[in-house]
């Protein structure tokens, strides 16, 4: 599929960047920095209006709709996708570099504008597995900001106390698997040559079939990642 994209002269919005270095490409780290700075600006524009943290505020969208829409537009402007959570070119690899932290993450002291993801359904709070939000506010005003549907199926935003939602991870980058159902104007994919062998390989006696399963898995995974992009796509390929 990568060769197809490279040979497609019409794909002006697609960039294939090969690397032999196991370090995260510097060009991508610079883009991540720009992305987080943009989010930090839009979240700070909202959080500096301290009245928004009052319990009596009610529907936040009715007060600061434009600022909130800016945050979620910025949040959805770039999606960084990895094949895996750990190892070379992984989600945790990026978190390590960008945040300087490993699990468990200190969400109270991280800077505003860091994207976050809920990893388990929480029916009481109305947050689902895979929902992406952002850190907002400082110190006693630190909150998780999520957009969700209320009981009337209306789209609303909600401040959530970090202490009430435990299953949260940074979402600077996410796995391709977790990205299913998401879209972004720009997608950057970190892709390695090492194949993930299908878990049913022990049932296959014919080696050619084993290779077919492995390639088929990779093809589906890469297809899922590529189709998250609405306008621009960068594929970083570890060769």
Model-inferred region functions:
Residues 1-125:
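Conserved helicase motor core of P-loop NTPases
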Residues 62-63, 79, 118, 123, ...:
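Low-complexity, intrinsically disordered or weakly predicted helical/coil tracts enriched
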Residues 113, 129-132:
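Glycine-centered loop/turn motifs
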Residues 131-139, 144-239:
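C-terminal accessory regions
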């Amino acid at each position: 599929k990568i060769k197809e994209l490279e040979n497609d002269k019409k794909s002006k919005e697609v960039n294939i960047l090969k690397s032999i270095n196991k370090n995260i490409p510097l060009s991508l780290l610079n883009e991540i920095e720009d992305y987080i700075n943009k989010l930090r600006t839009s979240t700070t524009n909202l959080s500096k209006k301290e009245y928004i943290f009052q319990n009596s505020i009610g529907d936040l969208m009715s007060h600061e709709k434009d600022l909130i829409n800016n945050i979620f537009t910025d949040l959805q402007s770039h999606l960084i996708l990895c094949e895996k959570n750990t190892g070379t070119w992984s989600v945790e690899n990026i978190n390590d570099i960008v945040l300087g932290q490993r699990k468990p993450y200190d969400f109270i002291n991280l800077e505003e504008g860091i994207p976050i993801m809920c990893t388990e359904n929480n029916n009481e709070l109305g947050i689902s597995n895979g929902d992406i939000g952002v850190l907002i506010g400082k110190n006693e005003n630190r909150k998780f900001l999520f957009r969700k549907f209320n009981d009337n199926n209306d789209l609303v935003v909600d401040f959530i106390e970090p202490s009430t939602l435990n299953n949260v991870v940074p979402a600077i980058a996410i796995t391709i698997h977790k990205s299913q159902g998401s879209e972004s104007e720009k997608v950057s994919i970190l892709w390695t040559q090492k194949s993930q062998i299908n878990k049913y390989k022990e049932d296959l006696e014919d080696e050619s079939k084993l290779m077919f399963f492995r390639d088929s898995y990779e093809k589906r995974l890469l297809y899922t990642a590529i189709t998250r992009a609405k306008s621009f796509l960068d594929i970083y390929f570890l060769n």
